[in-house]
């Protein structure tokens, strides 16, 4: 059972979250829950107040979608991201090889300086999903257009080469340009707003989706995708945070939710060390509603997403929702009731438990994480009697500057 925490705990946690910018700059906060939902109009248009602060959920001022704590840049809102529209229309040249990197960076710099304050210290999430930076990852009808367009580009640029050589030019040209676009964009963001946490939404990918595999579903990431993630060393080295998606697939049976989420996060932890002396923070994206039905996540769903993220030692989660959750007064009240009755109490419980475990087991110098990732019943939860417990199922992931089994040893 998850205890419904009282007013004292709510007020105490709220006081901890007053200076949210400072909180995001300091990794020594065990687990953060951020709000990336366009809910501002619930208050401004319909008069429905969503008490996010009191529930321990970090939001932008006025609950705006873009702000000082989290900003997400979509494909058509940032720089000159090249892609093909649903009708085959090429935007910004369509493929990375066709766009001017200098022009892209100039426009991106203007947008960063305009949209993010000079003291920005939140999450800066780039949502570029149309193509994958490695050639082999662009399969399926939606992404094969990038291979075809790249081959056409190579035929035009290198007409004297034979088809095999042109195909090689298409592949290398695509991958080099894609890398330059993504890598330089991250470097630019970190140069202009160095206190922000910059990364790409959905990366690293895992490829463990549900394909009606029934009893042989393991949740493991696809071996080919693990290999590609290893090849993307440059992307992890250029990032300052990782934002994998743990959206629950519509047809995935609930019995497999935990293993689905666990393997996605474990792959993120694996690449988080690449090119860095200390692991990158991992903040997983959680969708508030089920895509197929629009239903809010149940308490069990929250345990298998937010709860598993906390128990594995993630830095936090980002809650995402679309405009439908604030489309009317009725929908806003539905969101309000869900926040107050289900989501909020669970967030308070997990963040309080993560802090307690950090202090009791890791001397406040690390995050608690499962000793055995397969230990499916152990969660960072406070019990109804408020017994914080010994957290025997958890080990420590030490913060920068600390080491040892309980993070008690200073590390230069």
From Swiss-Prot:
GO terms for cellular component: acrosomal membrane; acrosomal vesicle; cytoplasmic vesicle; early endosome; endoplasmic reticulum; extracellular region; lysosome; plasma membrane. InterPro entries: Aldolase_TIM, EGF-like_dom, Glycoside_hydrolase_SF, Hyaluronidase, Hyaluronidase-3. The active site is at 129 (proton donor). Keywords: Cell membrane, Cytoplasmic vesicle, Disulfide bond, EGF-like domain, Endoplasmic reticulum, Endosome, Fertilization, Glycoprotein, Glycosidase, Hydrolase, Membrane, Secreted, Signal. Residues 353-408 form the EGF-like domain. Its EC number is 3.2.1.35. Residues 1-22 form the signal peptide. GO terms for biological process: carbohydrate metabolic process; cartilage development; cellular response to interleukin-1; cellular response to tumor necrosis factor; cellular response to UV-B; hyaluronan catabolic process; inflammatory response; negative regulation of ovarian follicle development. Disulfide bonds join 42-332, 206-221, 357-368, 362-396, 398-407. It catalyses: Random hydrolysis of (1->4)-linkages between N-acetyl-beta-D-glucosamine and D-glucuronate residues in hyaluronate. It holds the Pfam family Glyco_hydro_56. It is found in: Secreted; Cell membrane; Cytoplasmic vesicle, Secretory vesicle, Acrosome; Endoplasmic reticulum. It comes from the Eukaryota. N-glycosylated. Glycans are attached at residues 69, 216. One of its GO terms (molecular function) is hyaluronoglucuronidase activity. SUPFAM superfamilies: (Trans)glycosidases. Facilitates sperm penetration into the layer of cumulus cells surrounding the egg by digesting hyaluronic acid. Involved in induction of the acrosome reaction in the sperm. Involved in follicular atresia, the breakdown of immature ovarian follicles that are not selected to ovulate. Induces ovarian granulosa cell apoptosis, possibly via apoptotic signaling pathway involving CASP8 and CASP3 activation, and poly(ADP-ribose) polymerase (PARP) cleavage. Has no hyaluronidase activity in embryonic fibroblasts in vitro. Has no hyaluronidase activity in granulosa cells in vitro. PANTHER family: HYALURONIDASE, HYALURONIDASE-3. Belongs to the glycosyl hydrolase 56 family. This is Hyaluronidase-3. It comes from Rattus norvegicus (Rat). The gene is Hyal3.
